UniProtKB/Swiss-Prot annotation:
It is found in: Cytoplasm. The lineage of its organism: Bacteria, Bacillati, Bacillota, Bacilli, Bacillales. It comes from Listeria monocytogenes serovar 1/2a (strain ATCC BAA-679 / EGD-e). This is Catalase. Its cofactor is heme. Residues 1-26 are annotated as: Disordered. It holds the Pfam family Catalase-rel. Keywords: Cytoplasm, Heme, Hydrogen peroxide, Iron, Metal-binding, Oxidoreductase, Peroxidase. One of its GO terms (cellular component) is cytoplasm. Heme binds at Y338. The keyword Metal-binding applies.
Length: 488
């Protein structure tokens, strides 16, 4: 017979009765001296942390990444040097706008983030399933998210709010075309693609720099839902994507994605009619070919969702040697914001949590703060110092010098905005069925939207392709010709 496992308080003291509070007699009031009761209630009151302001609803899993082709000609990142190198990873998939317990069938971009625990420290890939974003400058990030979030007076999402914002933000048009395609309602997390959205810099041992974008392609294929299919699933189940991922891994049907890199030589940066570092612009595969990097396999579910999936923190600025951020204006803002939100949400020592802690050794002078549990014990907590046993800076890891483009500082309008050119490319690449789905999904979403807002959006759509605008206008009963004569 096995030894009985005692229920205890968080102080390790065994609990004799977990069913009844301590009272002053059978009919008297509860006693404040009941430590078991007070500890239990006080901890329950603090079980939750603030949910993420975006990407709150998520599912995650552990796995490994295997490098299939050496990337040493592009980057000195050690985990990408040799074929066959295995790196532990944790991946988190999410919806972007809606809350933690919202239906996973809602139209929304899907977050696609991967933490690589490399021997040189952590590397965070922080992307989405869709290859572009609504805005090109981080100063507009709070605005676009506010427009998509519920009305602060009614707590109800209102299409008038986000379509109003979109109509006055023409750079969002390409993202609209992806989001309101059926790719805005994926069938499962196992069947979504992933994109870095932003360009980054890779630097090799010779100091040569290239710009790159990264793409994840699911081996299961990209599978999406029509609006009708999503509604049918939502009527029965609003955890379908989390359940599918969990059950597939439990059953040994491990999902896999191939990672590809697209490469741009800096000397070619000005060779296009758009800015390749603009997050509202895609790098189409026929212009920027895919090169296979490796394969990710997810093979273990979290043991504790809160401690892992909910507490994991990502930042696109968490890069290893041989990688740097690009000058992308949206990316530059995210470099600050992502870690800042984790410090607010989880705490200043969130990187000490096991899910965030690197496998590589950590040695620095960052001490104390709220809830530190991996204390560094040396009495020397400053640098420079004269003690040989203390950690010292290593010039071998200084970031390579990078050319600065431009010599004027200020609030400058982005060059080559080309707000509709890539949207036109997307429209031209869509099949007849994909075009029909896009038009239908927009028309359906406009059922409660004011006519003046519809007209402003139709004017943007007209500048993408007159056929696109005319089909949406026909679906909403608007005479397009009355509103676009000045655009002809």
């Amino acid at each position: 017979m096995t030894d009985r496992k005692n229920l205890t308080t968080n102080q390790g003291v065994p609990v004799g009765d977990n069913q009844n509070s301590m009272t002053a007699g059978r009919k008297g009031p509860t006693l404040i001296e009941d430590y078991v009761l007070i500890e239990k209630l006080a901890h329950f009151d603090r079980e939750r942390v603030p949910e993420r302001v975006v990407h709150a609803r998520g599912a995650g899993a552990h796995g490994k990444f295997v490098t299939k082709k050496s990337m040493k000609k592009y980057t000195m990142a050690k985990f990408l040097q040799e074929e066959g190198t295995e790196t532990e990873v944790f991946a988190r998939f999410s919806t972007v706008i809606h809350g933690q317990h919202s239906p996973e069938t809602l139209r929304d971009p899907r977050g696609f983030s991967v933490k690589f625990y490399t021997e040189e420290g952590n590397y965070d890939f922080v992307g989405n399933n869709l290859p572009v974003f609504f805005i090109r400058d981080a100063i507009k990030f709070p605005d676009v998210i506010h427009s998509l979030k519920p009305d602060p007076r009614t707590n109800i999402q209102d299409g008038n709010r986000y379509w109003d914002f979109f109509s006055l933000t023409p750079e969002a048009t390409t993202m609209i075309m992806y989001l309101f395609s059926d790719e805005g309602t994926p069938a499962s997390y196992r069947e979504v693609r992933g994109s870095s959205v932003h360009a980054f810099k890779w630097i090799n041992e010779e100091g040569k720099t290239v710009y790159v974008k990264l793409r994840w392609v699911p081996k299961a294929g990209i599978v999406n839902l029509s609006t009708e299919q999503a509604s049918q699933i939502q009527a029965k189940e609003f955890n379908h994507a989390s359940r599918d991922l969990y059950e597939a891994i439990e059953n040994g049907d491990y999902p896999e994605w191939d990672l590809y890199v697209q490469v741009l030589d800096p000397k070619d940066l000005d060779s296009f009619d758009f800015n390749p570092l603009d997050a509202t612009k895609d790098w189409f595969e026929d212009v920027f070919p895919y090169e296979h990097v490796g394969t990710m396999t997810l093979d273990r579910n979290p043991d504790n969702i809160f401690a892992e999936t909910e507490s994991v923190g990502f930042n696109p600025g968490v890069l290893v040697r041989g990688m740097l951020p690009s000058e992308d204006r949206l990316l530059q803002g995210r470099l600050f914001s992502y870690s800042d939100t984790q410090r607010h949400r989880v705490g200043p020592n969130y990187l000490q949590l096991p899910i965030n802690s690197p496998k590589a050794p950590v040695a620095n002078n960052q001490r104390d703060g709220h809830m530190p549990f991996k204390q560094q014990t040396s009495s020397i907590n400053y640098e420079p110092n004269s003690y040989d046993t203390e950690p010292k800076e290593n010039p071998a890891f200084i970031e390579p010098e990078q050319e600065i483009r431009g010599d004027i500082s200020g609030r400058l309008i982005a060059e080559k905005p080309n707000n509709f050119g890539h949207a036109k490319e997307v429209w031209d690449r869509y099949s007849n069925a994909e075009r029909a789905a896009l038009v239908k999904n927009i028309v359906d979403d406009w059922s409660q939207v004011r006519e003046d807002i519809k007209i402003r959006n139709l004017r943007n759509f007209y500048q993408v392709d007159p056929e696109f605008a005319s089909r949406v206008a026909a679906g909403t009963g608007i005479n397009l010709e009355e509103h676009v004569t000045d655009l002809k």
